[in-house]
Design a protein with these regions (language model features):
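A short, flexible loop at the N-terminus of ABC-type nucleotide-binding domains that lies
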Residues: 1-5, 9-22, 29
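Q-loop/switch helix immediately C-terminal to the Walker
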Residues: 83, 90-105
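Conserved ABC ATPase "signature" region
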Residues: 105-117
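The feature captures the beta-strand-to-loop junction immediately N-terminal to the Walker
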Residues: 36-38
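Conserved ABC ATPase signature
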Residues: 122-126, 130
């Protein structure tokens, strides 16, 4: 499969300057594409467009030549955010949060070292690294084909970063997933990606 953007233009207001202008890229199944740029260049906005959270004013986001909206059921493009606490309901136990989109396979919970006792706990009772493991398990449902990692490990300690990337690279290889890895760290992108591009100014 291939995930593509063609000549994307996007701004957050009709009169505002565009955050993205004429942005085109392609990501193939099994590829690990790194995306580097300084802050404020529109990396997160691009991920939001690719995952269907926003719609461009111009251009298209296509999955195998079809608009993302044409795919029924769970979205085949998922995003893992930098701050996991912002994308989970603080009032729901984490087991219920996972079950909302279909309980992940037990092998994923085991591989991510998610303990059974954590399922009854609330987001505020877990560390950032523990919570990010939940978000990864939730994103990696069977229908997913492309995973967008937007600074997903930037706030974590080095040991947890290494554990998560080791898991992600193995999971992506076994399922032929396409990964888009957004990071300020050129060293990380060099280590985990098959190619890297820089966001234009």
């Amino acid at each position: 499969m291939i995930l593509q953007t063609k000549d994307l233009r996007f701004s957050y207001s009709k009169k505002g300057a565009p955050v993205l202008e004429d942005v085109s890229l392609s990501l193939h199944s099994g590829e690990r594409l790194g995306l580097w740029a300084p802050s404020g260049r529109g990396k997160t906005t691009l991920c939001r467009l690719l995952a269907g959270y926003e719609r461009p004013q111009k251009g298209e986001v296509l999955l195998d030549g079809k608009p993302l909206s044409a795919y029924a059921g769970p979205c085949p493009v998922q995003m893992v955010w930098q701050h996991p606490e912002t994308v989970v309901d603080p009032l729901l136990p984490l087991g219920k949060t996972l079950a909302e989109s279909g309980m992940p396979e037990q092998r994923l919970l085991d591989a991510l070292h998610i303990r059974e006792g954590w399922l009854t706990r609330y987001p505020g009772e877990l560390s950032g690294g523990e919570l990010q493991r939940f978000c990864l398990a939730r994103a990696l449902h069977p229908a997913v084909k492309f995973l967008l990692c937007d600074e997903s490990t930037a706030m974590l300690d080095l040991v947890t970063q290494a554990q998560i990337w080791d898991f992600l690279l193995r999971e992506a290889a076994s399922r032929d997933l396409g990964l888009l890895v957004v990071s300020h760290s050129a060293a990380l992108l060099e280590r985990v990606c098959t190619r890297t591009i820089t966001m234009p100014e």
